[in-house]
Amino acid sequence: MLVLALGGHARAEAPVRQVFLVQDSGWMEPFLTAEGSQFRPLVEALVAATRVPGADMAVATFDQDGQVPGRPSPRILYDGAYDAAKVRAAIASIDLPRKAGGTAYADADFNGALLGAIRTGLRGRDGVIWMVTNNKNSPGNSAEVERNTAAFYAALRDSAAISRIVAYPVRMPLKGRNFSEGGFVIYGIGYGAAGGRALESAVSAPALKALFSHPPVSLKPVLAGGLTLRFDRLDTGGLQAGLENGVLIVSGADAAAGTALRLTAHLRNGLYPQRVAAARLALSWSEVGTEAGLAQAAVSPAEIAELAPQAESGPLSVVLTLPPIQRPSGLAGLLSDGRTVDGTLTLRLADLRLALDPAFLERVRPIFGSGLLSGDQMGGPVGDARAVEGRLPGLFRDYRGVSEASVSLPVRIEAAFSPWPLIAAASAALALAAAAGLGALALARARVQTVMLGTVPKRVSLRPYRTQTLRAPDGSRWQVRAGLWGPARATRLQESGPGA
């Protein structure tokens, strides 16, 4: 495993360094010496396609450190900002070094090259390493070199410091003076979190896509960006639904009655070169908040098979059922016109079985079909696709450990409550307010009424619930009080005696 410590995270806007590491051991002879070889122009194009403005880069070669006197491995040929002429000169200077004291070409130490590229090329910090190699060692290498080769693949697979790996197998049949080759591999290795993001950005860029006729092989993680859902029809039954910034928004659902949303979806296999040989499908719903499981989801068919790389499945019927939603109690619930339900639809692929695309195996047969293997490959004849797969580096076979996958889609359901309870409450409030207004008006207005003061009628202007004292023709005093309705009432007051 890698023992180098990751450096501190660079600022988000700071580009990371890149190292272009080219193998120059003996098995690279046809690529470096054959007449008409397009190897060097392709490496130049790789550097140009992945360059990042403002970022430094390095061009280096690797073989086996210590085999060539005075020549370290990796050997930096150029270090600095991208300059097409200087990069071209550096790549043109790549040669085939020979071991000390003989004519044999140098061997290759992949693990030493990886560690050296991190220490020297990346200076121990996050970055991207592009390793151009034919994945071969001499069969006469020492046990130490074989251990180093195995350690190289173990580091790529197991080290948490290496966050992302892609590979571009390149067919390039060439014949040199001593060897014939069918092609080589370009590995993109993201070191550290920032290096992984930079590598992902590079492989998504149009310039690099234009350089290769096939997508890169995603080696780590295997399922990186591989499976996605696409909706092409929303059978909403009168509802409004659509995708906004990756979220499925459904509006107009009836909260009181509940609703069922029917969608037609397709599962896209963005993996390469793995095909989905078989998988069982199950759809689940998880909701944000306390009422988890409020909605229910289902998908049919329940199985999928033979989904080719970079292809879409047939139509999948997705049903999302939302039961009735209770209006919250109290005034807040009465005033609420609806409720928003946030959740996630998750399509799970269980018993997932991936397999390599036969067309890919046929394409890479000349690259990996040689009898000379690196420490992570398996032997055997190369008569069929299974044998070719057995000769791939183990990283290319790590997909066999994947047995499940999932695809998630955020969903927001905007359910509306009926306005009638609010209308009824508002009407009652208006009626009450009107009655209160009429009552206040009646209280404030005086009415002329006829009041009986004993046997004598008298007309007087009275306000409701206010008392007046009147004197009758015979000199008696009366207290008069009127209400909102009915006649006013008169009460005779007791006269004070002369001694009072």
PLM feature spans:
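…and closely analogous acidic/polar surface helices at protein-protein or active-site interfaces
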Residues: 14-21, 25-59, 143-159
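DG-centered beta-turn motif at the end of beta-strands
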Residues: 22-25, 126-143
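Von Willebrand factor
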Residues: 69-128, 167-173
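VWA/integrin I-like adhesion module and closely mimicked acidic/polar interface patches used
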Residues: 136-194, 355-395
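Von Willebrand factor type A / integrin I
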Residues: 155-253, 260-261
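Membrane-proximal extracellular "stem/stalk" segments
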Residues: 249-417
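Selective detector of the "anchor" transmembrane alpha-helix that sits immediately C-terminal
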Residues: 416-444
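Cytoplasmic C-terminal tails of single-pass
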Residues: 444-500
